[in-house]
Curated annotation (Swiss-Prot):
GO terms for molecular function: NADH dehydrogenase (ubiquinone) activity. InterPro entries: ComplexI_Subunit6, NADH_UbQ/plastoQ_OxRdtase_su6, Nuo/plastoQ_OxRdtase_6_NuoJ. The chain crosses the membrane at residues 1-21, 25-45, 47-67, 88-108, 149-169. Gene3D superfamilies: NADH-ubiquinone/plastoquinone oxidoreductase chain 6, subunit NuoJ. Core subunit of respiratory chain NADH dehydrogenase (Complex I) which is composed of 45 different subunits. The keyword NAD applies. It is an enzyme of class 7 (translocase). Pfam families: Oxidored_q3 (PF00499). It is found in: Mitochondrion inner membrane. Belongs to the complex I subunit 6 family. Core subunit of the mitochondrial membrane respiratory chain NADH dehydrogenase (Complex I) which catalyzes electron transfer from NADH through the respiratory chain, using ubiquinone as an electron acceptor. Essential for the catalytic activity and assembly of complex I. It comes from the Eukaryota. This is NADH-ubiquinone oxidoreductase chain 6. The lineage of its organism: Eukaryota, Metazoa, Chordata, Craniata, Vertebrata.
Amino acid sequence: MMMYIVFILSIIFVISFVGVSSKPSPIYGGLGLIVGGGVGCGVILSFGGSFLGLMVFLIYLGGMLVVFGYTTAMATEQYPEVWVSNKVVLGAFVLGLVVEFLIVIYALKSGEVKIMFEFDGLGDWVVYDTGGSGVFSEEATGIAALYSYGVWLVIVTGWSLFISVVIIMEITRGS
C-alpha cells in the first residue's frame, strides 16, 4: 500500500511541475510550486524523514508563500490566463502529461527502476560514542553533516535564494 501512495505522490509531484513549466499566469505557477513542494514533503515523510519533511515544509513553503504572495500581488491581472485559454499552453501541458505517462508505462513494463546514485561508505561523516544506550536519529546526523561539511553549499544556496528574490522583485516591478 505504501508503494502505491509514493507512486501516486510522485505522479502528482511531476504533474505539478509540468503545470509550473507551462504556466499561463504567475498565480498558477506559484500554485503548482506549492503543490509540488507539499507533495515532495509527503514523499520525504513516506520514506521516514519526518524531521526533514517538516523542515522543508516549514521553510520552503513558508518562504514561497511570502515570495509568491508578493509577486502575484505585483503582477495581478484582472482576467488571468488559464491553461485552457491558450492552445499552445494547453498543448504543452498535455504533451508533458503524455510524456510522463509513457515513462510510467515503460517503468511498469520493464519491472524495475535503477538507482542512479549509490551512497555506500558515507557513514564516516559523523563520529558518535556508542558506549551509552539511547535513540539516535539519522536525520539530525544528516542535518549536522550538511551544516558542518557542506557549509559552502548552505552559503551558496542562501545567496542564490536572495538573488532570486531580488530578480523576481525587479521583473515584477518593471511590468
